[in-house]
Swiss-Prot record:
It catalyses: dTMP + ATP = dTDP + ADP. GO terms for molecular function: ATP binding; dTMP kinase activity; nucleoside diphosphate kinase activity. SUPFAM superfamilies: P-loop containing nucleoside triphosphate hydrolases. Keywords: ATP-binding, Kinase, Nucleotide biosynthesis, Nucleotide-binding, Transferase. It comes from Ectromelia virus (strain Moscow) (ECTV). The keyword Transcription regulation does not apply. ATP binds at G11, L12, D13, K14, S15, G16, K17, T18. Belongs to the thymidylate kinase family. GO terms for biological process: dTDP biosynthetic process; dTTP biosynthetic process; dUDP biosynthetic process. This is Thymidylate kinase. The gene is TMK. Gene3D superfamilies: P-loop containing nucleotide triphosphate hydrolases (3.40.50.300). It holds the Pfam family Thymidylate_kin. Its EC number is 2.7.4.9.
Length: 204
């Protein structure tokens, strides 16, 4: 039995990640594809993250970085098992978000990557570009919903994309929504059909 593909959606806040993930789940109906999003706010670490994001509690930046990382590690075994059972996972945010946001707040990228090292490695990362309209819409109740900060996050994403050690697919913000939806669906289907070999380990 061939394994499933680990397909991650990344991008700035309000770039449409969740919408595109849901489009995939609706347009590729199958019992061999599942959706997972981070942070998972139902766990112990997830509830602490939710309190932080909604400004109910404050933590220093190092603790925040570790909380987000621990939240992903809580699901590392689940992800590995699902992929080995032939289940493709569509993941809304992953380690790249953690590294980009931490680096935007001043944490060394190499340090943040070391926390995530060994997580299941994505077969494909789809990065949704944000147009000026979406970026300027990044003002909200949660702590990171700030235009200036989001621009810093974008620069950190670009650094990771340029490294070339991960298969990134950048989706332009200039596409019409129906064109974008169809393009992403085709990219995901191709990734599902061409995945080979064992599950890799991220940043090892």
């Amino acid at each position: 039995m061939s394994r499933g593909a680990l397909i991650v959606f990344e991008g700035l806040d309000k770039s449409g990640k969740t919408t595109q993930c849901m489009n995939i789940m609706e347009s590729i109906p199958s019992n061999t594809i599942k959706y997972l999003n981070f942070p998972q706010r139902s766990t112990v670490t997830g509830k602490m993250i939710d309190d932080y994001l909604t400004r109910k509690k404050t933590y220093n930046d190092h603790i925040v970085n570790l909380l987000f990382c621990a939240n992903r590690w809580e699901f590392a075994s689940f992800i590995q098992e699902q992929l080995e059972q032939g289940i493709t996972l569509i993941v809304d945010r992953y380690a790249f978000s953690g590294v980009a946001y931490a680096a935007a707040k001043g944490a060394p990228m190499t340090l943040s990557k070391s926390y995530e090292s060994g997580l299941p490695k994505p077969d494909l990362v789809i990065f949704l570009e944000s147009g000026s309209k979406e970026i300027n819409r990044n003002v909200g109740e949660e702590i990171y919903e700030d235009v200036e900060f989001q621009q810093k996050v974008l620069q950190e994403y670009k650094k990771m994309i340029e490294e070339g050690d991960i298969h990134w697919q950048i989706i332009s913000s200039e596409f019409e929504e129906d064109v974008k939806k169809e393009l992403i669906k085709n990219i995901v289907i191709e990734a599902m059909h061409t995945v080979t070999g064992p599950v890799g380990q991220l940043w090892m």
